[in-house]
């Protein structure tokens, strides 16, 4: 290998052209950048990047090939009060690295210094970037492009979904390969979901605190390298990209979209006491929101916050998203703590990143889902994201739980949430699909735990049960824990059925947490982010098959109801919906606000949802006509009903006319 040629300022990252590798690095405040390459024995050779165009440093290394391990040492001022923390003693990951070798360990050499720089060299323990080739044969792959109105999302963890699946080959359980295996594809099709939403798959690290406690970051919301796949779920690190793309291709052939949960709000460098392994040492002032005293704005609760209004960071974020779409063919993203994306530092719908995404022909056409809050002032922004974003709807989650798990909730409030929360999302030209309805998610109780626990039980997390929310709107039905007498277990089953029916038969985009259709429990842990064990892994051998069948039947029923699949707002008199009381008459103003939780919802003039959320068996007079219960509510003896349905306490049934 020779000295570096000047090379080009684009594309960003390390790009192999068949003859060598072009390297680029964005840093607005650096004074000098060294490329450091390592041989198989760990010997290091350094090259100054000779070119600079604007804020991008670049150089070309002839003869370099995929597999080359590299990093950067970036020279510049150490001025903490101004937000500058350059320290060339620290080897830094390329933010655009497509593969990472080594883990981010809790090691003192990885700290760049607090008030004064730590000049101890860290190359021996620092993770390394690795040059790759992106070539892959996609064959005839095509994106399913499922319309929002027909979309049913299934949120899952790569490892936890398949690690205990007895029908999968042992060697692929808990890996990318398992996602596209025929056993899993067949299950997804049988269940009826249309999109698999994966918790973070970009390379992530366990926080030093967890490492010291003997725990790991299981969920993955602590990103190291946003362009690199987490290698632990591959047969080998060099195979991660191809194995992930194989899974995407297999899922696409079955008509199933792949959505990635992506963390663009903070990095694993954490606060000023965290490790310096990339952005902090490359250009701390540009990449992060810095306070006047040089510390970080912590709007994420993770110690730092990415400055997604800085032009260089906006470009980084957009290129990251485009990489996953163009190189890995993913169909969309769920953005963690997405209010950070709109901070300028206050939240704005025309924030630079939102504008860039909307203007991008690649990104503006995939599914974009915001978790519409962060922990900073003004961070709660449900309903305020611009199109084409959809949003997690916590109003729906809380209302569904409060309606069925006895709490005070009016019929009017329930109906509003059932109708895609039009008071929140019917703005800026957005359709009902912008409301992503959920009962549960990775963060919080599972559905089974919602009906078994009144209190969180997070002792295993090592924080003396202080972590996790206390606002669960759950109901143990009279006994804390999973067990109980038969009548209690039946009441819990009925509550689960009612909640699932509410989720899957409401207007908006439903999201189902993997395992809720099995009856999976985390034994009351509502913050299992550090539990990479049987607490979070789905136990397929113990799955409640009847509940799975019930859930699949609800999804099939949903796809038959035009009022739910049309993705247009319901208007009075359009035939999509009628709201009726227990006597099949329009609900009065008093019944909307003060009446018992009894109602009927007539959809598309032929599907009737009869609801008795009271504690008493109640007769409900059906609208005129002949009605027959539909699966999963129809029994073997399924007579035509022409007058009255005897609604059991906390009961729900769906009928079809004719």
Curated annotation (Swiss-Prot):
It is an enzyme of class 3 (hydrolase). One of its GO terms (biological process) is glycogen catabolic process. Keywords: Carbohydrate metabolism, Glycogen metabolism, Glycosidase, Hydrolase. Pathway: Glycan degradation; glycogen degradation. InterPro entries: GlgX_C (IPR040784), GlgX_Isoamylase_N_E_set (IPR044505), Glyco_hydro_13_cat_dom (IPR006047), Glyco_hydro_13_N (IPR004193), Glyco_hydro_b (IPR013780), Glycogen_debranch_bac (IPR022844), Glycogen_debranch_GlgX (IPR011837), Glycoside_hydrolase_SF (IPR017853). GO terms for molecular function: glycogen debranching enzyme activity; hydrolase activity, hydrolyzing O-glycosyl compounds. It comes from the Bacteria. Removes maltotriose and maltotetraose chains that are attached by 1,6-alpha-linkage to the limit dextrin main chain, generating a debranched limit dextrin. Belongs to the glycosyl hydrolase 13 family. This is Glycogen debranching enzyme. It comes from Salmonella paratyphi B (strain ATCC BAA-1250 / SPB7).
């Amino acid at each position: 290998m020779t000295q570096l040629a000047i090379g080009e300022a684009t594309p960003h990252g390390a790009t192999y052209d068949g003859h060598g590798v072009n390297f680029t690095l964005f840093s607005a405040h650096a004074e000098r950048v060294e490329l450091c390459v390592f041989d198989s024995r760990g010997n290091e050779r350094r090259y100054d990047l000779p070119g600079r165009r604007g804020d991008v440093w670049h150089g070309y290394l002839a003869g370099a090939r995929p597999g080359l391990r590299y990093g950067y040492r970036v020279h510049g001022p150490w001025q903490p009060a101004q937000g500058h923390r350059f320290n060339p003693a620290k080897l830094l990951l390329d933010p655009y690295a497509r593969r990472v070798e080594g883990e981010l360990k809790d090691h003192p050499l990885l700290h760049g210094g607090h008030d004064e720089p730590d000049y101890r060299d860290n190359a021996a323990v620092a993770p390394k970037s690795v040059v790759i080739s992106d070539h892959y044969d996609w064959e005839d792959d095509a994106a399913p492009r499922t319309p929002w109105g027909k979309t049913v999302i299934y949120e899952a963890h790569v490892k936890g979904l398949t690690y205990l699946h007895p029908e999968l080959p042992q060697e692929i359980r808990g890996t990318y390969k398992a996602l596209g295996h025929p056993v899993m594809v067949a299950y997804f099709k049988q269940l009826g979901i249309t999109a698999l939403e994966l918790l973070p798959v970009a390379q992530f690290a366990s926080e030093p605190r967890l490492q010291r406690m003997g725990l790991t970051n299981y969920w993955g919301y602590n990103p190291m390298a946003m362009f690199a796949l987490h290698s632990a779920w591959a047969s080998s690190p060099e195979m991660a990209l191809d194995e992930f793309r194989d899974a995407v291709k297999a899922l696409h052939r079955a008509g199933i979209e792949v959505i990635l949960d992506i963390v663009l709000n903070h990095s694993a460098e954490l606060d000023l006491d965290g490790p310096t392994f990339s952005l902090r040492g490359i250009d701390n002032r540009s990449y992060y929101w810095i306070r006047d005293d040089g510390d970080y704005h912590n709007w994420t609760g993770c110690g730092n916050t990415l400055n997604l209004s800085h032009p260089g960071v906006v470009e980084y974020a957009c290129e990251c998203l485009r990489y996953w779409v163009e190189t890995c063919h993913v169909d969309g993203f769920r953005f963690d703590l997405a209010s950070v994306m709109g901070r300028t530092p206050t939240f704005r719908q025309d924030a630079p990143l939102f504008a860039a995404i909307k203007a991008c022909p690649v990104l503006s056409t995939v599914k974009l889902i915001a978790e519409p809050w962060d922990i900073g002032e003004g961070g709660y922004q449900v309903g305020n994201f611009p199109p084409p974003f959809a949003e997690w709807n916590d109003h729906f989650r809380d209302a569904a739980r409060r309606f069925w798990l006895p709490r005070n909730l009016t019929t009017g409030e329930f109906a509003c949430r059932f109708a895609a929360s039009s008071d929140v999302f019917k703005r800026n030209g957005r359709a009902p699909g912008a409301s992503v309805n959920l009962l549960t998610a990775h963060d919080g109780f599972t559905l089974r735990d919602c009906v078994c626990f009144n209190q969180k039980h997070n002792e295993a997390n090592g924080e003396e049960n202080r972590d996790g929310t206390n606002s669960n709107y759950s109901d143990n039905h009279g006994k804390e824990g999973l067990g109980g007498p038969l009548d209690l277990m039946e009441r819990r089953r009925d509550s689960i059925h009612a909640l699932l029916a509410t989720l899957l038969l409401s207007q908006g985009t439903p999201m189902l947490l993997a395992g809720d259709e099995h009856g999976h429990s985390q034994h009351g842990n509502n913050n299992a982010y550090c539990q990479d064990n049987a607490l979070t892994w789905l136990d397929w051998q113990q799955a409640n098959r009847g509940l799975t069948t019930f859930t699949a039947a609800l999804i099939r029923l949903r796809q038959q109801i035009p009022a739910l699949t049309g993705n247009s707002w319901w208007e009075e008199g359009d035939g999509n919906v009628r709201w009726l009381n227990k006597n099949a008459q329009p609900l009065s103003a008093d019944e909307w606000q003060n009446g018992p939780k009894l109602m009927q919802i007539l959809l598309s003039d032929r599907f009737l949802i009869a609801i008795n959320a009271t504690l008493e068996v109640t007769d409900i007079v059906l609208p005129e006509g002949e009605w027959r219960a539909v699966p999963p509510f129809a029994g073997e003896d399924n007579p035509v009903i022409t007058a009255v349905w005897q609604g059991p306490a906390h009961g729900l049934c769906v009928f079809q006319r004719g």
